Curated annotation (Swiss-Prot):
Belongs to the UPF0178 family. It comes from the Bacteria. Disulfide bonds: none annotated. InterPro entries: UPF0178. This is UPF0178 protein Shewana3_1627. CDD domains: PIN_YqxD-like (cd18720).
C-alpha cells in the first residue's frame, strides 16, 4: 500500500478549495498533486506539485485514474472520474464536501446522465450554484475527517 496523497482535478476546482488544500498539505506534510491542462499558480512547497497534461477530453482525468492508489483522495466534481477512482479503491470528495461512495455513485451517475440527456434535447437545466461559505466549510470538515486517518 502506498503513502497517502491528495490528487486534485484542478482545471475546474475553485480557488478557495485549492487554498484549503494548500494549507492542509503543509500542515500534514502530505503530498498534494494538482492535475490540469494549463499551468497553475501553486505556492512553493516540497509537498505541493502540479502536473500539466495535454489538452483534450478527459486527459487530466485519465492521468489521475492511472496514478491513484487506494490510500489516496481525489478532489473532483466530475462524477465519472469519481466513479473510476472508487473502482480503484480510492476515495473521491467533491468541492462542496460530499464524499462519493460505492453506495451513492451509481445514483449520481444516473442523475448526471439524465441531466445530460435533458440538455442535449434542448432543455436549459442551469449550472450549479456558486460555492458558498457553507460549501467551503463542508469541504474543510470532510477533508479534516480524512486527514485524521493520515
Amino acid at each position: 500500500m502506498g503513502q497517502y496523497k491528495i490528487w486534485v482535478d484542478a482545471d475546474a476546482c475553485p480557488n478557495p478549495i485549492k487554498e484549503i488544500l494548500f494549507r492542509a498539505a503543509e500542515r500534514k506534510s502530505l503530498p498534494l498533486v494538482l492535475v490540469a491542462n494549463q499551468m497553475l499558480r501553486v505556492p512553493p512547497s516540497p509537498y505541493i506539485s502540479q502536473v500539466r497534461v495535454g489538452s483534450g477530453f478527459d486527459v487530466a482525468d485519465q492521468y489521475i485514474v492511472n496514478h491513484v492508489e487506494p490510500t489516496h483522495l481525489v478532489i473532483t466534481a466530475d462524477i465519472p472520474l469519481a466513479a473510476q477512482v472508487i473502482e480503484k479503491g480510492a476515495l473521491a470528495l467533491n468541492p462542496r464536501g460530499e464524499l462519493y461512495t460505492t453506495d451513492n455513485i451509481r445514483q449520481k451517475l444516473t442523475m448526471r446522465d439524465f441531466m445530460e440527456d435533458l440538455r442535449s434535447s434542448g432543455v436549459h437545466t442551469g449550472g450549479p450554484d456558486a460555492l458558498s461559505a457553507a460549501d467551503k466549510q463542508a469541504f474543510a470538515n470532510s477533508l479534516d475527517k480524512w486527514l485524521v486517518r493520515v
